[in-house]
Regions:
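An interfacial alpha-helical scaffold signature
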Residues: 2-165
Length: 165
């Protein structure tokens, strides 16, 4: 899909799903890497660009937790792809959708939002430069951790021994 076709598609939809914001302008197509395989592209305003896909102006919802998990993973994968393509990005929360308004469609609303916040977005991108976001999950067995703690602490061993008698 060309940048012009992506923009034309956005004009027909009433919403834009926003993954992140990065520096730079112009239109770039990242390809069909978005939620449900949507084509992801950028919408630029000045020296700021938003990484988006066209969508209906309503939240993504599913009663199936696996579907929602897939969407969240796809969202994160797009943010990573944008980071590789554009450098520092300011990630948006899952399911951030810009709707068109009385002044035009979703593209016009998004550009107006970026223009109003251009300086603030640039400062946030500057603060994030050279940093990365990580998620850490820790899984542990309570009994093993308790035994390890007791083994290394005399006071805990005494309390364990007193409680057992």
């Amino acid at each position: 899909m060309t940048a012009d076709l992506a923009t034309a598609t956005a004009a027909k939809e009433d919403g834009l799903y926003v993954y992140c914001v990065a520096r730079g302008g112009g239109h770039h197509v990242l390809g069909p890497i978005g939620l449900d395989g949507q084509v992801v592209y950028t919408v630029g305003s000045g020296n700021i660009r938003a990484v988006v896909h066209s969508c209906p102006a309503e939240p993504y919802q599913s009663p199936d937790a696996r579907v929602v998990e897939g969407w969240v993973v796809a969202h994160e994968n797009v943010v990573r792809a944008a980071t590789q393509a554009f450098g520092t990005v300011l990630p948006m929360a899952f399911d951030m959708i810009v709707r068109g308004g009385s002044g035009g469609g979703a593209v016009a609303a998004l550009k107006a939002w970026m223009e109003e916040r251009c300086d603030r977005l640039a400062r946030r991108l500057d603060r994030l430069a050279g940093r990365a976001e990580y998620a850490v999950q820790v899984f542990w067995d309570r009994q093993e951790v308790a035994a390890w703690l007791v083994q290394g602490d005399e006071a805990l061993r005494r309390m364990r021994d007193e409680a057992g008698s």
